Amino acid sequence: MAYEEQLDKIINEDGFIAALDQSGGSTPKALLQYDVDHSFYKNDTEMYDQIHSMRERIILSPSFNSKNIIGAILFEMTMNREMNGKKTAKYLWEDLGIIPFLKIDSGLESEANGVHLLKDIKDIDKKLENAVSNGIFGTKMRSVINSASIEGINDVVNQQFKLSHQINKHNLIPIIEPEVTISISDKENAEVILIQSILKNLEKMPKSNKVILKLSLPEIPNFYQPLMKHESVLRVVALSGGYDQTNAIKKLECNNGMIASFSRALTEGLSINQNDEEFNLIINKSINNIAKASKT
């Protein structure tokens, strides 16, 4: 069964999870990094066509394969489109051996208590059923922590874990992402509160439920080791969070057992103006460097 094979791969294989799920407000930034400015599109439909073309170019590049990449996180619109004549998630798994995940959140609430909670996810069960029918293995939801607020961080973690129970019921594996903003002055304190809150929620989880944790690279190396040892945690992955690729890799190398799930740091240096040879050379180098750092 594909699910059992994917589960084994997520737990045991070397490599990283590519984050290709830019959406909404983050799409223009991602396109600008790729040298696609507003002159390339007149409306949202054309903007999403441009981001899909970029993602397709990445996924179809020769180095985007299961040698270094365990999984890929997709935006819903990408999941609903095709690559090489197949729905994207099926193409990733059946042709490349890469596990597909789906970003399911609907964005963030306004900041309160130093954090951004998730907006209500409308028709979540329908969304999860659709994910399963498209061959998706797991989901991802991103919250943001801007302050070492005990109340705020507990709210973020509690909300994420509550949703994770619902996701597990659909036989999907949730990636829980409570991102700590890298520029805040009390980041280390926020991480202390965060790990305590996550451990409390893990202890309350049914033993059959499993999660993946996607966390900002910590101030103290190997700080998240206790989470990696928990029986309910399949993997702890790192977001790049605004660090450039060089710094993200350096920080990742200091955290044994943590693997990358980079977005901006993965696509760094890519441009619509590059020919295929130039493009493939850069993405190949990035994939190899990120995969190497994920093996420490």
Report residues per predicted region.
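Alpha/beta catalytic barrel-like cores
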Residues: 1-137, 145-148, 190, 197-215, ...
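Eukaryote-skewed repeat-based solenoidal scaffolds used as protein-protein interaction platforms
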Residues: 139-174, 179-214
